[in-house]
Curated annotation (Swiss-Prot):
InterPro entries: His-Me_finger_sf (IPR044925), HNH_nuc (IPR003615). GO terms for molecular function: endonuclease activity. Its EC number is 3.1.-.-. It is an enzyme of class 3 (hydrolase). Disulfide bonds: none annotated. This is Uncharacterized HNH endonuclease L560. Keywords: Endonuclease, Hydrolase, Nuclease. It comes from Acanthamoeba polyphaga mimivirus.
């Protein structure tokens, strides 16, 4: 039978199972509650401060596509924004970010969250290598550079990549303060 408009199957939206609960699998260590996420995050633990657990546990939390825990019960509310709303007891402006200090999207403890402007949040990006802000110019010649407010701050003629990474870290700390995301340097 050839599909026609009338007998063609309709697209359906898959919703997470409503029978699951995050409260089925959780544990507490040192005033931090670790709980399993549902859906694609099954087996992944998110964590919150113990004082927020009674409220957080009322909702189902899933691992969103972006890697953040989300609740569809709250209209795709991300857990870190939900927690911070509880901390400040009010609404967070849409143009303000809730930043994970340690860059771990699953760590939603009170002490790991802070408010940040979009610019401050961009300062705090993590790196996958020791080369953030470092560029090789030629053999044994590197430069360290940081951009803030459209102005490039740079130091050239640095003999090693490691030294350039250290100099970048110092410049970033001076310019961005607590929002600086330094290179990881092995000593």
């Amino acid at each position: 039978m050839k599909p026609t408009k009338s007998n063609k199957p309709k697209k359906t939206t898959k919703f997470p199972k409503q029978t699951e609960s995050n409260t089925d699998d959780f544990f507490i260590i040192d005033s931090v509650v670790y709980f399993t996420l549902l859906g694609r995050g099954k087996g992944t633990f998110a964590f919150v401060s113990l004082d927020k657990w009674p409220i957080v546990s009322k909702y189902k939390w899933y691992l969103g596509k972006s890697g953040y825990p989300v609740s569809y019960d709250l209209g795709k509310m991300q857990l870190h924004r939900f927690i911070y709303t509880l901390i400040i007891e009010g609404k967070i402006p849409s143009d303000i970010y809730v930043d994970h200090i340690d860059h771990n999207k699953l760590n939603n403890t009170n002490s790991n969250l802070r408010l940040a402007t979009p610019q401050q949040n961009s300062f705090n990006k993590s790196t996958s290598s020791n080369k953030k802000g470092v560029r090789k110019i030629s053999e044994n010649n590197y430069k360290a550079s940081v951009v803030k407010n459209g102005i490039t701050h740079e130091i050239k003629n640095i003999p090693t990549e490691e030294q350039a990474a250290q100099i970048y870290n110092l410049m970033a700390e001076e310019l961005f303060g607590e929002f600086a995301a330094p290179n990881k340097i092995d000593f």
